[in-house]
């Protein structure tokens, strides 16, 4: 069971549950946060470079968060972040797409001064056809097991 930074391993993988994104989801988000016609108006979207309604990239990013949280990648600990690297929108997300994410730990860095570690997980979102639509690598902070050394945990610096 994952509970601490010291329980994580390089190459460890996570798979989130699936969730369908609806036309209503796309329009509601876009009206508030990215009010462009190709996100808010199906008829207008047909006459744009997108050739139809598509989710805002920022909606795709926000849509990912509850799916990731459902996997509990850091056990009972909340997901705290220091930043995001390599954020990419790879393909359009359309109404009715069923989305999930797959993640892999790519870096583990124990803190030298605090009882925590830094974790890089590369997440990729896929639609129901297996097409990658979004990827990003958040940099997370996870507590260390109390009183454990790097040598005891097997973490390589």
Predicted regions and their residues:
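HotDog/MaoC-like acyl-thioester-processing domains
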Residues: 2-10, 89-152, 156-157
